[in-house]
Structures are given as structure tokens and as C-alpha cells.
UniProtKB/Swiss-Prot annotation:
GO cellular component, one term: cytoplasm
GO MF annotation terms: 3-dehydroquinate synthase activity; metal ion binding; nucleotide binding
Gene3D superfamilies: 3.40.50.1970, Dehydroquinate synthase-like - alpha domain
Protein name per UniProt: 3-dehydroquinate synthase
Domain of life (superkingdom): Bacteria
Native source organism of the sequence: Pelotomaculum thermopropionicum (strain DSM 13744 / JCM 10971 / SI)
Lineage: Bacteria, Bacillati, Bacillota, Clostridia, Eubacteriales
Name of the coding gene: aroB
Length: 371
């Protein structure tokens, strides 16, 4: 078991990563000054696979465990779902010293974290992510939220977990599509932060797709290490942390315009990273050769790289204005300057973006990856 620490003063916490560590959940939580009541939140699929092991580990450590299940998918990430979880927390007798444990992917973690942040003004929260995307991204950094009909993650908070436990053995049961989806966020870290990690991914993408435990453990640990470094410097996204949104301005627009029914989050981010790499090339910020490497790796991961056919540029750009990063009508994109470094770009003109998208995003050839 490897440990990555997120150093945030009184809100610091460890990320434990490795194979076969779910059985240690109770012992690790028991080492913290928390009460003995726990609400374990999961979805039916994950709970059927790992719920009993997690609950038994908590019970062995002296915790009284109540269970709540929520549906899987973005359509369940709502205030209505949160309301049902508040009811379950009251029924289970949770008080201000109790804990909520999220066992599942990003939706479970986001909703459970939002409930933990707001129940009795905040109780202890533990992330036990079981998808690659959640292990490398959504479980780390304290972003918790539910969706609103007008936008994704509009209702939320920054609320750090007490610990994160990422057992890479849970990835063995992950469908191939979800594994590829998680790789989008892994690739993101290489593009925005570490040229060396990006090069490692180019050499090891097949091993990751084949589920090789050693490669997965390294990718999870390195991704968490990079995200921890960013979060430590900018916990509440006032500046630097915005680079973690590379691929997400376009990605969120794609998700919304396809009603969250066509693409997984990671697939949408893959499209976003490809389009935004093309945008960086069109602006003269990124070398065409570097853009080509980014597109090739996205394709090798089995992720989509082009906007959906028939998606009107006008509607796409309009969705950009609903993005949380847009401030006072100014659009904000995170664009790579080179592999290993990304910057925040503000104030791109609407007409330029319309031209860019209408032309098949400029210097980026749709579906070809030649930039």
C-alpha cells in the first residue's frame, strides 16, 4: 500500500493506493477521532461486488454501519437524491461525530460528499473510489456537488475527505468502456503537469488497457500525486487549480448537449482535450507536433476525439457560457502550451470560436488526429 499525502493544514488527509486494501478500511477510519456510526453509500452494482467486504471491515473495527444505495449515472446526481440520503442519515441516528463513506464511482462520491458537507453543517467523509476515473480524479481534492437542470455540478462545495482509499483490485470488475473513460483523466495529468508521465503513458497505454496491476497502481499513484500538488497550492480554484479543467469546458458542453446519455464523463473529456488541443494549435500556443502526440494518445486509449456529428457550433458555444469557469460573460479555457504545461486562457471571442468549430476546429483534422 502506497500513501500520497494531501497537505492542507488542518484539512490534510492521506490517499492510500494499492491492491487488496479495501479490507483495511475499518482499521484506517478507526485510527481517526470519529464516532462509531457510519452511513455507507453505494450503488447496487458496486455494493453487490464490494459492499459486504467494506461493511465487514468497518464492523470489525467497531463501527455500526447503515447502508444507502443510490442509482448510477448523472441523472441520479440531484437534490432529490441528496434529500433521500438525509432521511437515511436521520433514520440511522448519525450525529456530528458520525461518518459517511462513499463506495463507488464519481456519482456516488459527489453526492455522498455533498450530503456529508451539508448534513449537520458537515460530518466526516471518506472516499472509497471503485472506478479508475474516481480513483485518479473525483475522489481527490474535495469537490462535491449535485447537478441542476441548468448545469452540471452547479450546487456544491469544497469539502475535503478524511481519507481516500483506492483499491486497484476493484478495477478488475470495471467494464472496458469505464476503464477507457478513466484514462482520459490520467492523460490529462500528463498534458497539464508532467511531460515524463505523459511519455510513460505513451509507452504503457496497452498495459493499462489490459488491466496490469503494476501499471494501474503506478498510474493511480502518480495521478493522485499530481492532483495533490495542484490542490495544495490552490484548494478552492482561485487560480492554478483551474488547469485541472483541461478538456472540461468542451467536455461539459458535449455532455449537456447530448443530455448525459451518449458519452461517459471521461469520453466527453477526451473529446474536450482533443478539441482544446486543436484550439491551442489554432491560437499558435501549441506546436502541431505536440498536439499530434496528445491526439494520438487519446485515440490509443480508445476515446472519441471529435465532436458529435450534427452538433451546431452555435449551441456548443452557447453552452460554454454556462460553464462555471465563465466569469462576467468571459469564456475561460485551459489550453496546453506544451506537453507538461497548461495555462488558463480568458476572453476568447465568440466569433473566433464559431469559426473554429465550423471549420472542423481549425488545424485539427476531425478523426485523423493530424495537427
Amino acid at each position: 500500500m502506497e500513501t500520497v499525502n494531501v497537505n492542507l493544514g488542518k484539512r490534510s488527509y492521506p490517499i492510500y493506493a494499492g491492491p487488496g486494501i479495501l479490507q483495511d478500511l475499518g482499521e484506517l477510519l478507526g485510527g481517526l477521532p470519529v464516532g462509531r456510526k457510519v452511513l455507507l453509500i453505494s450503488n447496487p452494482t458496486v455494493f453487490s461486488l464490494y459492499g459486504e467486504k467494506a461493511a465487514e471491515s468497518l464492523a470489525r473495527a467497531g463501527f455500526t454501519v447503515a447502508v444507502a444505495e443510490i442509482g448510477d449515472g448523472e441523472e441520479h446526481k440531484t437534490l432529490a437524491t441528496a434529500g433521500r440520503l438525509y432521511d437515511r442519515a436521520f433514520e440511522a441516528g448519525l450525529d456530528r461525530r458520525s461518518s459517511i463513506v462513499a463506495l463507488g464511482g464519481g456519482v456516488v462520491g459527489d453526492v455522498a460528499g455533498f450530503v456529508a458537507a451539508t448534513y449537520m453543517r458537515g460530518i466526516s467523509f471518506v472516499q472509497v473510489p471503485t472506478t479508475l476515473l474516481a480513483q485518479v480524479d473525483s475522489s481527490v481534492g474535495g469537490k462535491v456537488a449535485v447537478n441542476h437542470p441548468r448545469g452540471k455540478n452547479i450546487i456544491g462545495a469544497f469539502y475535503q475527505p478524511r481519507l481516500v482509499l483506492a483499491d486497484v483490485d476493484t478495477l478488475k470488475t470495471l467494464p472496458v468502456r469505464q476503464m477507457r473513460s478513466g484514462l482520459a483523466e490520467v492523460i490529462k495529468y500528463g498534458v497539464i503537469w508532467s511531460r515524463e508521465f505523459f511519455a510513460w503513458l505513451e509507452q504503457n497505454i496497452e498495459a493499462l488497457l489490459n488491466g496490469e496491476a503494476g501499471a494501474l497502481a503506478y498510474a493511480v499513484r502518480e495521478s493522485c500525486r499530481i492532483k495533490a500538488q495542484v490542490v495544495e497550492q490552490d484548494e478552492t480554484e482561485q487560480g492554478l487549480r483551474a488547469v485541472l479543467n483541461y478538456g472540461h469546458t468542451v467536455g461539459h458542453a458535449v455532455e449537456a448537449l447530448t443530455h448525459y446519455r451518449v458519452y461517459t464523463h471521461g469520453e466527453a473529456v477526451g473529446i474536450g482535450m482533443a478539441v482544446e488541443a486543436g484550439l491551442a494549435v489554432a491560437l499558435g500556443m501549441l506546436k502541431r507536433s505536440e498536439g499530434g502526440r496528445i491526439i494520438r494518445l487519446i485515440r490509443q486509449a480508445g476515446l472519441p476525439e471529435g465532436l458529435p456529428e450534427g452538433l451546431p457550433p452555435e449551441k456548443t458555444v452557447e453552452k460554454f457560457y454556462h460553464d462555471k469557469k465563465a466569469v462576467e460573460g468571459q469564456l475561460t479555457f485551459v489550453l496546453p502550451e506544451r506537453i507538461g504545461r497548461a495555462v488558463v486562457k480568458n476572453g476568447l471571442a465568440k466569433n473566433f470560436l464559431l469559426e473554429f468549430l465550423s471549420a472542423g476546429y481549425g488545424l485539427l483534422e476531425r478523426g485523423a488526429g493530424r495537427v
